[in-house]
From Swiss-Prot:
Residues the entry annotates as binding Ca(2+) 3: D78, S81, D84
Domain SAM: start-end pairs: 333-396
Cofactor (UniProt): Ca(2+)
Organism lineage: Eukaryota, Amoebozoa, Evosea, Eumycetozoa, Dictyostelia
Binding annotation for ATP: L607, G608, T609, G610, A611, S612, G613, K614, V615, K628
GO cellular component, one term: cytoplasm
UniProt region (Disordered), positions on chain: 412-520, 532-574, 901-986
Active site per UniProt: D722
Name recorded for this polypeptide: Probable serine/threonine-protein kinase DDB_G0272092
Amino acid sequence: MARKIGSVRIEVLEGRNLVPMDSNGMSDPYGVVIVGDKKKKTKAIKHTLFPKWESDNCFEFDIDVNLLAITVEVYDWDRFSSDDRMGLTNIPVSQIQEYIVDTTKWYTLQPMKPNDKVSGEIKLKIRFDKDKTLPPPEKSPFIKAIKDNDTQAIELMMNKAKLDYTICDNEGTPAIHIAAASNNIPLITMLLKGSDARVSIRDQHGNTPLHLFVQKNVSLNCEDIINKLIERGCGINDENNLGETALHKACLATVVQKTTIVEQLLQKGAIINHQTKTRDTPLHYAIKVGKVEFVRFFLQNGANVMIEGGKPSRTPLELAKELGNPQIISKVEKVIEISDWLNELQLETLIPKFIKNEIYMDVITDINEGTLDLLNISVSGQRTKLLRAVRKIKDPLSLSSNSSLRSNSLIHVENDNNNNNNNNNNNNNSQEQCNINNDSLGSGNRNSGGFKAQNQNNTLNNNNVESKSTGNLNSLKNIHNVNNDNNEDKKNNILSPNPIPASSSAPAAPSPVAIGSNTTTTTTTAIAATTTTLTTTATTEDKTTTESTTPPQQQQQTTTITPTKTTTVTPEGPNLDVSDLSVLKHINLDSDSWVIDEKTLTYNVLLGTGASGKVYKGTFNGQEVAIKVLKSFTDKKDIAEFKKEFQIVSALRAPGVVYFHGAGIKDKLCIVMEYCSRGSLYHILKDDTTQFTWDNFFNLGTQAINSLDSLHNWTPQVLHRDLKSLNLLVTENWTVKICDFGLSRFDTGSNLETLGKLRGTYAYVAPEVYFGKKYTTKSDVYSMGIILWEMTYRCIKGTHLLPYAEYPHLKFDYQILISSAKKDVRPTTPENAPESLKNLIARTLVKDSTLRPTTLEFYEELLKIRDEYNANREQWDSIRTIPPQQLPKPIINEEIIPSIDSNNINNNNNNNNTTVTSEKPKLRYQPSNSNLLNNNNNNNNNDSDNNISEPATTDSITKPISKVKEQLLTRTRSSSSPMEPKSIKK
């Protein structure tokens, strides 16, 4: 037991200017005093921001040598949910020991967690009473000899008798720990020679002798001692009671020390990013104690600068800025800058080499072929990309004139007069021009959709001039990675190679207008998703423009300018080619075998419509497929999202993921995937005409978790980020497949900022995502936990309920998100649900993500619960409620039974806002057994009568089948909630 040094008396007096937590602008504050593992709290003072505690507010505690600080926390009492955090203050024991008389002070409240809203102060009265009793003399001569560093006495004792190395001193510290902390190398060596020396034992703080040795030792010749301690049982990554490893303790050495011991620990297998119970890494410790050389060494050896740790949680850079150490701030910032730069270039594998050799952005322009040789960078593609990027930093304009801007459009200029000299166009200011976005450093994208009409001499034939229109889209071979969402909105405009004269006016892309004094121009294009007719009359002195909207079926854009020259633009396809997609990281594609000729696709049924495109049921090579078509193929953000989804679906070949057949990139951007005939899990749960039994529950539930596990175990790891029952599809043979990877990301360094953004359907979003923390596998587990709750409720209650629908005051998704993240509100599991199932759901939905199970643990636990069900089927089945419409019915011939046909279901919901269409209901009978797994009805209707030919553009499809209507369904909760399909009307 730790030695007592005194006692402290703390009186919580009052607070002022506290943060309002209730809707009425008030709070119900109370205080909690924490000393070690002991807590005592005051009563709550109702409806005030200036509380005064006058009773039950005085507490006394004993203080021992191990206590570092006393904490006082303030909370807002809440009758119906968890209490809200209002702030805390930490008072060091060293400061408290100075308060030998009653001392009253105001203490400013700090946030308990980074995003907490905190204000105000709390007034405390503190007095410290020192313990005047002297420690008793050591009873053991062995302990006394160690503390006196008497090696001769110890050697005599070892020769005379067998010594007990586990004997402790008066404070409970074992003999071997006292020796390890003595900084006496001969003494420690002598003890370790004892064959019975047990060095794996722990002291009262959970430290091994290795913990104490690396903290107290000042000798550089200590490798033999470390080796012997490890050989005798000290684990290199063993944790003490605070979660500290030997590497953490080495950072706390009280004397100025080189990194020798730290180097030795890493060589022995110490985990450089190991986190304590407060999530601190060794890098955090080195920053806290201000050891610049340690920080430098950790950074050079792979320390993660994005890990948050401490209380409140901070990244290493945030911590360094808070402590105000300019040297450490500079080193951490340099590492972040070079890492971001290499990530944008998709060269993250080179980050360790650059950091190890301290090649940061301040010297990046000095890189040449010789530097790359010294760094042992031999891959030609990496060398080319690096040298190109370095040239762009030196001169951002140097590459713009050589850029090859792709386009599939031709501009045909028809001149009614005898114009054989294109220079007349320039004299009349008729040159078409648009800005080209720079792909310079830090800009993830170029602007797409703009094009420039360039008159070309020597192409005149029968008064026709053909000139090429060049589109502008980033090629990932030559510019930075677009995986980071934060890059999408960065735009750096530069002058094009042939800038417009100052007197000219350049219209905005994607519909450039030729401005001239005596010209008539007609432009036809399929670039824009919305079709318009533009009539423009312009002279050098006066320009007027009128715009009217044409019917959606008319896919042309006409621009009329008075009077004599006509320009026709042929429909422009996507500004993408094979190289744009083949160059993406992590994809498993050979050459261009994945490219699908859109002419081989047949569009049969419109399954759903979202903000960025549509999903069709169709055929490819005689096989039913789902075709996801991008609505706009010139919007740079849409194209970037298309690339991201393509990158995920083309890379994954897991059995629990919808199969990727290929993609079309010529006439339209589309992804062709496996068609799942039974639709989504959401629609299966929503179908209230069919029973959802425990067998269904366990069969689909285990498959769903297993499918998620296949994503998390992929290399590199995939995070779905939008997991919900609507994105779990079910095939004809009841196999669960995960779909909709529009928000999914690889868990790599290039996606760190993206993974910290709020994404997904709010009812399924984990609390940490709301607070801006990085999205992890445990965030996906939370979403799967909500899905498991959804299935549990449907199985027990017999009806489907959306998550949080039992709370009538939560009408909008943002209310759900705030309540779940800040109030710890969770969907209510049925009271009669089996206890094991309730516990599993609760574990997956716990606020602390580190306490949630992994997908493997989740899967294994559900299998155990399934075994429990199989052993107690009657008991489990007895708690289920079966509505009358789900009871077995006799076969009724020729009866039309409304149901959710598989073709009615959105096979790949590409957006939260989804328009669902359905097919004509078919004749079928109600099976005597309503079990879903025994329902063998053929859901694949013969759609031969409904086939339609491929549209010229995706937006011309308003009725994929003449007998089918698109029905937009709305809900009062939010547009991000799942849509409900309805039967088709003729």
